[in-house]
C-alpha cells in the first residue's frame, strides 16, 4: 500500500504508511490518501462481524487497518490496537456501542467513551500508540504541532502525554473554548505538553500549523509532525468505527442492500470524510449527511456547489464551538476523489482559485451532480435556538442528554429523516459535561459530571499566549521543545 498527495504531479513519489504517519502534510501542501482504496466484500464484512462479536472492537480495527498498512507486522499492529482500544481507558467494553434513540426513529453511535469524553479519542488513542511504536523502531523523535477548536487538543494531549520521543505544541483560539475544555488541556503540566492560546480563531491556528509544515527546513530540523486530521492515520482510525456502526445496526447476513445512513456533525470534514472512505471501500452506507452549525460553509457547498471559506472575522462564535470552523482542512481529500483523483485539478481549486477568488464553484458541473448521485452526500444546518430546543426535546422524549454538537446532528437528522430509507445513525461527538453552560441554558440544570472529571476546573493551569504570527510560533518551538526528549 502506497500513499499519494492530493496535489500530486506526474513525478511525485509515493510514500509508505510509516513515512506519512510521521510527516503529516505532504511537501507540496496536499494531503495524503492511499493510491487506491481497498475493498470489503460481503464475505469480508461477514468475517469482520464475527471478529467484532467474538474478539472485540480492537481486533476488528486491526483487521481493517491492516488493509492500509503493510510496513508494520500483523502481530505488532494487533498489539497496537489492543493497547489503544481497551478498558478502562474506554468506559464501555464495546468501545463504540450503538443504540436506538427512543422516540426519534434514529440511532446514536456512542463515540465519547474515551479518556476525554470526545469522539477524537477514537483516533488519538491509536495515533499515540502508532507514534511511540514507530519512533522507537526508528530511534527518532517528533514535535507535534497541532490546532484545536475544543476537543482535538485535549484528546491528543491525553494520548501523547509522557510518551518517549514526543513533544506536543497545541494551538487554541483564545477565549473560544468552554471552561471545561480549557481546563482539560491547560491543567496538564507534563513537560512534553505546551499549550498555546493564539490571538485569533481556530482557522488562524490551523493556518499557523500549515505554515510551519510548509517551511521544509524548519520542519526537518524540529521533526514536525501532525495530529490534526490532516494526518491520514486519524482518518484511518475513524473508518473503523463506521464499519463497526454498520455491523452493529444490521443483522447477520446483511448484504449491500442493507443501507445504513449517517448524520455527522461537521466542522473540519475529517469525521464525515472517514464515512466517505468507508463507503468507497464497499461498506453499505447510504446517505452521508453533513450537519453544520451557523458556520455553514460546508452546507453551502453541498447545496449550491460553491465552496467559500470565511475570514477569521466572519467565523461566528457559537454554542457548538468545536464546529466553529470555516476552512475545512479535510475537504480537499474528498474533492480529490470527486475530481477523479486529478492532482492538477485539485491544486487548481485549492491553490489557484481560492487564493485568487476566495472561493471555487462546481455548480453546473458533472462533479456537483455526483455529490448526491454517486457519493451520497446531503447536508443541513442548525442554529443556537435549534440546538437548545433539541437538547431539551431529546431529554424529555428519550431521557438522553445530548451535547450541543450531537444536538446539531439530531436536529438535522430529524429534518432529513422523511427522505431517507432504512436506519439513520447520528454520530455522537462528546459528552454534555464539556458544555455545561449550554446544557444549563437548554434544560435548566447542569449536566452530570463523570467521576473522573470531578474538580477539573479548579486545577492549576499552564498556557502561553501567542500573537497570530508564524515567526512567533517558530520562536516558541525553539524555546520550549527539547529535541529527542
Model-based region annotation:
Residues 1-485:
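PLP-dependent amino-acid enzyme catalytic core
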Amino acid at each position: 500500500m502506497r500513499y499519494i498527495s492530493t496535489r500530486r504531479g506526474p513525478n511525485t513519489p509515493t510514500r509508505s504508511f510509516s513515512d506519512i504517519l510521521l510527516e503529516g502534510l505532504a511537501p507540496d501542501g496536499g494531503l495524503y490518501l492511499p493510491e487506491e482504496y481497498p475493498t470489503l466484500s460481503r464475505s469480508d464484512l461477514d468475517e469482520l462481524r464475527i471478529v467484532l462479536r467474538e474478539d472485540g472492537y480492537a481486533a476488528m480495527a486491526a483487521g481493517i487497518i491492516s488493509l492500509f498498512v503493510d510496513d508494520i507486522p500483523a502481530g505488532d499492529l494487533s498489539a497496537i490496537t489492543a493497547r489503544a482500544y481497551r478498558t478502562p481507558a474506554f468506559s464501555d467494553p464495546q468501545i463504540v456501542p450503538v443504540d436506538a434513540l427512543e422516540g426519534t426513529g434514529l440511532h446514536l453511535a456512542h463515540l465519547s467513551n474515551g479518556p476525554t469524553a470526545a469522539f477524537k479519542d477514537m483516533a488519538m488513542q491509536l495515533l499515540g500508540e502508532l507514534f511511540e511504536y514507530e519512533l522507537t523502531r526508528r530511534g527518532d523523535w517528533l514535535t507535534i504541532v497541532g490546532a484545536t477548536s475544543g476537543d482535538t487538543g485535549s484528546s491528543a494531549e491525553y494520548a501523547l502525554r509522557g510518551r518517549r520521543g514526543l513533544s506536543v505544541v497545541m494551538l487554541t483560539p483564545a477565549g473560544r473554548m468552554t471552561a471545561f475544555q480549557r481546563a482539560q488541556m491547560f491543567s496538564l503540566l507534563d513537560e512534553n505538553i505546551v499549550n498555546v492560546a493564539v490571538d485569533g480563531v481556530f482557522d488562524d491556528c490551523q493556518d499557523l500549523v500549515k505554515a510551519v509544515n510548509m517551511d521544509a527546513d524548519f520542519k526537518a530540523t524540529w521533526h514536525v509532525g501532525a495530529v490534526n486530521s490532516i494526518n491520514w492515520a486519524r482518518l484511518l482510525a475513524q473508518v473503523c468505527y463506521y464499519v463497526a456502526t454498520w455491523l452493529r445496526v444490521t443483522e447477520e447476513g446483511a448484504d449491500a442492500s442493507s443501507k445504513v445512513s449517517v448524520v455527522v456533525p461537521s466542522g473540519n470534514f475529517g469525521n464525515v470524510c472517514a464515512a466517505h472512505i468507508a463507503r468507497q471501500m464497499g461498506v453499505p452506507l447510504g446517505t452521508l449527511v453533513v450537519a453544520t452549525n451557523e458556520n455553514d460553509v460546508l452546507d453551502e457547498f453541498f447545496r449550491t456547489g460553491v465552496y467559500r471559506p470565511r475570514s477569521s472575522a466572519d467565523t461566528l462564535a457559537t454554542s457548538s464551538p468545536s464546529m466553529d470552523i470555516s476552512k475545512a482542512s479535510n475537504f480537499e481529500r474528498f474533492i480529490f476523489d470527486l475530481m477523479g483523483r486529478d492532482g492538477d485539478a485539485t491544486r487548481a481549486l485549492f491553490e489557484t482559485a481560492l487564493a485568487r477568488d476566495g472561493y471555487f464553484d462546481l455548480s453546473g458541473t458533472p462533479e456537483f451532480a455526483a455529490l448526491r448521485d454517486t457519493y451520497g452526500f446531503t447536508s443541513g444546518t442548525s442554529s443556537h435556538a435549534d440546538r437548545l430546543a433539541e437538547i431539551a426535546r431529546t431529554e424529555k422524549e428519550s431521557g438522553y442528554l445530548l451535547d450541543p454538537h450531537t444536538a446539531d446532528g439530531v436536529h438535522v437528522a430529524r429534518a432529513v429523516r422523511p427522505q431517507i430509507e432504512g436506519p439513520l445513525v447520528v454520530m455522537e461527538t462528546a459528552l454534555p459535561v464539556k458544555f455545561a453552560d449550554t446544557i444549563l441554558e437548554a434544560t435548566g440544570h447542569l449536566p452530570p459530571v463523570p467521576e473522573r472529571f470531578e474538580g477539573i476546573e479548579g486545577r492549576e493551569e499552564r498556557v502561553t499566549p501567542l500573537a497570530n504570527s508564524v515567526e512567533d510560533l517558530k520562536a516558541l518551538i525553539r524555546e520550549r521543545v527539547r529535541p529527542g526528549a
